[in-house]
Curated annotation (Swiss-Prot):
Residue positions, PTM Phosphotyrosine: 265
Deletion consequences: Embryonic lethality around E9.5. Early embryos show growth retardation and incomplete closure of the notochord, as well as placental defects in the spongiotrophoblast and syncytiotrophoblast layers, resulting in an arrest of vascular branching morphogenesis. Conditional knockout mice lacking Rbm15 within the hematopoietic compartment display a loss of peripheral B-cells due to a block in pro/pre-B differentiation, as well as a myeloid and megakaryocytic expansion in spleen and bone marrow.
Gene Ontology MF terms in the entry: mRNA binding; RNA binding
Organism of this sequence: Mus musculus (Mouse)
Mod. after translation: Methylated at Arg-577 by PRMT1, leading to promote ubiquitination by CNOT4 and subsequent degradation by the proteasome.
Phylogenetic classification of the source organism: Eukaryota, Metazoa, Chordata, Craniata, Vertebrata
Primary role: RNA-binding protein that acts as a key regulator of N6-methyladenosine (m6A) methylation of RNAs, thereby regulating different processes, such as hematopoietic cell homeostasis, alternative splicing of mRNAs and X chromosome inactivation mediated by Xist RNA. Associated component of the WMM complex, a complex that mediates N6-methyladenosine (m6A) methylation of RNAs, a modification that plays a role in the efficiency of mRNA splicing and RNA processing. Plays a key role in m6A methylation, possibly by binding target RNAs and recruiting the WMM complex.
Sequence ranges assigned to domain SPOC in this UniProt record: 778-957
Name of protein: RNA-binding protein 15
CDD domains in the cross-refs: RRM1_RBM15, RRM2_RBM15, RRM3_RBM15
Length: 962
């Protein structure tokens, strides 16, 4: 009769035989989702308890006998027929079966996404008995090794879905085998799990009761949801054709609600439970190393579980796998932010070669001011080579430099430095390789010393960061030359003009929350001479173009650049380096917008569009001028030839009146978004509306820029004709003696002491009036500011037409020093060869020299933009001027402001044997020091707060005497 009670069980044995391959290869991927969900829990325990190579059919008989033995034990001395046996099962063992059924329902609700059939539930709640009896029944009396542990393990496996204060960020991968090396396993697991989020892999050796240590891998995620998604999506994992076992390692953030968990946690472990094939015994043997049950006593947890199930408090089903956009947003395999990922390993048990992590090593790179792309490697083996280090570290990223320091006499330690391409690579290598054995020694890893450069690497970016936002945040620290960034990339490179600006951005932008509090930036220095390969290098945009994408779109594929320029593509980025300088935000003079008055202001309109064109495509670049030395006349010719056909066939050419309302709508929401340099914020006295109008005029369209260039060339021809006629008139006026007249009283005379200088200055003055004084207010202020010099200022391979007007001091000082040292004739160009930092002690020294020199020993001049044809009209132009590129004066002003320095020129040019007649010229950009020399007439002559230089000339003999 007892056999009748066991008769239905063999009919379920084929189900078990079919499930046994899952039990043996619990990490395989070749099983459907339904079978995986139905058989997850029984396959887990059976796969751990039995060897995968044992026969599968013997399992059914053993399950049947074990079930019979269990029914006898639970039934006590029940009846001998089938009905009495059934009553015994439902009566005497109601409590145990209720637990099994409830646990199976809980597991079914957690893992079955589409619902299961009744047969699957029947199979599920009978599985704990099978698992418990498979051990031979000897662990039945043990509270840790029998059904209590399996039930507690089953309950713990449902904990992640329930969220009862228990979560996991770590997956334990076991059954790795011994054929593959630790690095090969770590690298393979990293590539398998990196798509789910920020992940790190650590290999550990756990001491076991078998022949040796068991090698396991801990896959640590930054977020618990990433770990859950990886566990559900990678429930069946085959690595190198070897099925692996995946377990979740739970970390308790608060104590369990079990009534009997007073002594639940072992002092040496923070692991409270495992799922999906958890061990029945502790790795150390006997279960003394870690506790797999949150409750400490299996019976107490079972009572608590029954109580919770009776109240209907079942854990909710697990969340669905994260959307596939996760891979697109996290397509980089490095850390966004590192949590204490490896804190479990030393507690679980570390191998002999694994050094425990310290808390200082777990600081995220967003918070660690020492974090950079250079790693310090200590305790290296004396025989280590560069190839050894590259083999060990090249899987973490691109290694740019390896430096090994061999021990000298009296030293015993070998250390080295390893430089990666960026901070993400070095940080991941630091966490993964700290304590690893290379050759014979476990290495110690720390951060090296950062090497400041003008180029920054910025990490922690993503689709949420537009290019305009990146430029706006980093432009506060100085002038940006280029930004290499494509929206959606995880990193960017920002090139500054100065090292101070880059260092300030490196200091203040580390950890900056760009896009939210959990999206913080990582900043490090990068190599300036190395061009990193990217699929697309986007130039630094204009702010109003980026705010409205449809207007920004027509600038990126600019076909006119390739038609005009023949320079390499890398130079295009350099040409946009000055697009975000502060000089771009200067309000324009009103006559520029009145095209009807073009005849009266031909010289002004001639250089304003040229200024815009040069800033647009030939931005201020001192590094690339060797490859771009075309003369302005030759560069304007192709523009003239293309203009008629392009203006007739394209619709980009619009008048300023038609374009102004449309673009003002784009610019109106962005007054606060315009880039401002922190060092120059106090100098912006113009309102934002005027700044926006300047942008509209200068950034209208490429065709408008070329039309301005054509108008410039046409106006140059008219200027030459006018200057030729004016030249004849001035010859008659300058016949009278000019000595003894006050230069500040009479405009027609520029020098009261030197006749040759007077003649030269008077000849060159009317073009300056056309250039700088085309309006009535400027002409009215000209009598107070006589023209002292006209020519070219040179800096490296660029020349800047300028005119100098006397502000203070003696004009004789300027006339006697602004000459050729060898011939004594008037000099046509002044080359800046040195810079003077605008530090307060140095400014005080300049002030002291002016006071010591006295009223006849110095001259202060105001340099404003000169006419563009001054070089051609000057008879003393040299080969240096002919080989350089002409640029507007505001580019020189912007360069000096960005460098926070003044240009220095030794006078006279070329040196002088007469030591008594020497001096120094300082060219100061707009700053607090230079503002003290400007009065209202001088400001009216300058027309703009960002388009002038203050020149201070002091005689050297007076300097030496002071």
């Amino acid at each position: 009769m007892r056999s009748a009670g066991r008769e239905p069980l063999p009919r379920r044995s084929p189900r078990w035989r079919r499930a046994s391959p899952l039990c043996e290869t619990s990490a395989g991927w070749r099983v459907s989702q339904l079978r995986r969900d139905d058989l997850r829990r029984p396959s887990t325990m059976k796969g751990k308890e039995r060897s995968p190579v044992k026969p599968k059919r013997s399992r059914g008989g053993e399950d049947s006998s074990s079930r019979g033995e269990r029914s006898k034990k639970l039934g006590g001395s029940g009846g001998s027929n089938g009905s009495s046996s059934g009553k015994t099962d439902s009566g005497g063992s109601r409590r145990s079966l209720h637990l099994d059924k409830s646990s199976s329902r809980g597991g079914s609700r957690e893992y079955e996404t589409g619902g299961g059939s009744s047969s699957s539930r029947l199979h599920s709640y009978s599985s704990p008995s099978t698992k418990n009896s498979s051990g031979g029944g000897e662990s039945r009396s043990s509270s840790r090794g029998g059904g209590g542990e399996s039930r507690s393990s089953g309950a713990a496996s449902s904990a992640p879905g329930g969220g009862d204060g228990v979560e996991y960020k770590t997956l334990k991968i076991s059954e790795l085998g011994s054929q593959l090396s630790d690095e090969a396993v770590e690298d393979g697991l990293f590539h398998e799990f990196k798509r789910f989020g920020d992940v790190s892999v650590k290999i550990s050796h756990l001491s076991g009761s078998g022949s040796g240590d068991e090698r396991v891998a801990f896959v640590n995620f930054r977020r618990p949801e990433d770990a859950r998604a990886a566990k559900h999506a990678r429930g069946r994992l085959v690595l190198y054709d070897r099925p692996l076992k995946i377990e979740a390692v739970y970390v308790s953030r608060r104590r369990s609600r079990s009534p009997l968990d007073k002594d639940a946690y072992a002092p040496s472990s923070s692991v409270v439970g495992t799922s999906v094939g958890s061990h029945r015994h502790a790795p150390g043997g006997g279960g003394g190393q870690r506790s797999l049950s949150p409750g400490g006593a299996a019976l107490g947890y079972r009572d608590y579980r029954l109580q919770q199930l009776a109240l209907g408090r079942l854990p909710p089903p697990p969340p669905p796998p994260l959307p596939r956009e996760l891979e697109r947003e996290r397509d980089y395999p490095f850390y966004d932010r590192v949590r204490p990922a490896y804190s479990l390993e030393p507690r679980v048990g570390a191998g002999a070669g694994a050094a425990p992590f310290r808390e200082v090593d777990e600081i995220s790179p967003e918070d660690d001011q020492r974090a950079n792309r250079t790693l310090f490697l200590g305790n290296l083996d004396i025989t280590v080579t560069e190839n050894d280090l590259r083999r060990a570290f090249d899987r973490f990223g691109v290694i740019t430099e390896v430096d090994i320091k061999r021990p000298s006499r009296g030293q015993t330690s070998t250390y080295g430095f390893l430089k990666f391409e960026n901070l993400d690579m070095s940080h991941r290598a630091k966490l993964a390789m700290s304590g690893k054995i290379i050759i014979r020694n476990p290495i110690k890893i720390g951060y090296g010393k950062a090497t400041p450069t003008t180029r920054l690497w910025v990490g922690g970016l993503g689709p949420w960061v537009p290019l305009a936002a990146l430029a706006r945040e980093f432009d506060r620290f100085g002038t940006i030359r280029t930004i290499d960034y494509r929206k959606g990339d995880s990193w960017a490179y920002i090139q500054y003009e100065s090292l101070d600006a880059a260092h300030a951005a490196w200091t203040h932008m580390r950890g900056f929350p760009l896009g939210g509090p959990d999206r913080r930036l990582r900043v490090d220095f990068a190599d300036t001479e190395h061009r990193y390969q990217q699929q697309y290098l986007q130039p630094l945009p204009l702010t109003h173009y980026e705010l409205v994408t449809d207007t920004f779109g027509h600038r990126a594929p600019d076909p006119l650049r390739s038609a005009r320029d023949r320079t390499p593509p890398l130079l295009y980025r350099d040409r946009d380096r000055d697009l975000y300088t502060d000089s771009d935000w200067v309000p324009p003079p009103p006559p520029v917008r009145e095209r009807s008055a073009r005849a009266a202001t031909s010289a002004v309109t001639a250089y304003e569009p040229l200024d815009s064109l040069d800033r647009r495509r030939d931005g201020w670049s001192l590094d690339r001028d060797r490859g771009d030395r075309d003369l302005p006349s030759s560069r304007d010719q192709p523009r003239k030839r293309r203009l008629p056909e392009e203006s007739g066939g394209r619709h980009l050419d619009r008048s300023p009146e038609s374009e102004r309302p449309r673009k003002q709508r784009h610019c109106t929401p962005s007054p606060d978004r315009s880039p401002e340099l922190s060092s120059n914020r106090d100098r912006y006295n113009s309102d934002n509306d005027r700044s926006s109008r300047l942008l509209l005029l200068e950034r209208s369209s490429p065709v408008r820029d070329r039309r301005g260039s054509l108008e410039k060339s046409q106006s140059d021809k008219r200027d030459r004709k006018n200057s030729a006629s004016a030249e004849r008139d001035r010859k008659h006026r300058t016949a009278a003696p000019t000595e003894g007249k006050n230069p500040l009283k009479k405009e027609d005379r520029s020098d009261g002491n030197a006749p040759s200088a007077s003649t030269s200055s008077s000849k060159q003055k009317p073009p300056s009036q056309k250039q700088d004084g085309g309006t009535a207010p400027v002409a009215a202020s000209s009598p107070k500011l006589c023209l002292a010099w006209q020519g070219m200022l040179l800096l490296k391979n660029s020349n800047f037409p300028s005119n100098m007007h006397l502000l203070q001091g003696d004009l004789q000082v300027a006339s006697s020093l602004l000459v050729e040292g060898s011939t004594g004739g008037k000099v046509a160009q002044l080359k800046i060869t040195q810079r003077l930092r605008l530090d307060q002690p140095k400014l005080d020294e300049v002030t002291r020299r002016i006071k010591v020199a006295g009223p006849n020993g110095y001259a202060i001049l105001l340099a404003v933009p000169g006419s563009s044809d001054s070089r051609s009209s000057s008879s003393s132009a040299t080969s240096d001027t002919a080989a350089s590129t002409q640029r507007p004066l505001r580019n020189l002003v912007s360069y000096l402001k960005q460098k926070q320095a003044a240009g220095v020129i030794s006078l006279p040019v070329g040196g002088n044997k007469d030591k008594e007649n020497t001096g120094v010229l300082h060219a100061f950009p707009p700053c607090e020091f230079s503002q003290q020399f400007l009065d209202s007439p001088a400001k009216a002559l300058a027309k703009s707060e960002e388009d002038y230089l203050v020149m201070i000339i002091v005689r050297a003999k007076l300097v030496n005497s002071g």
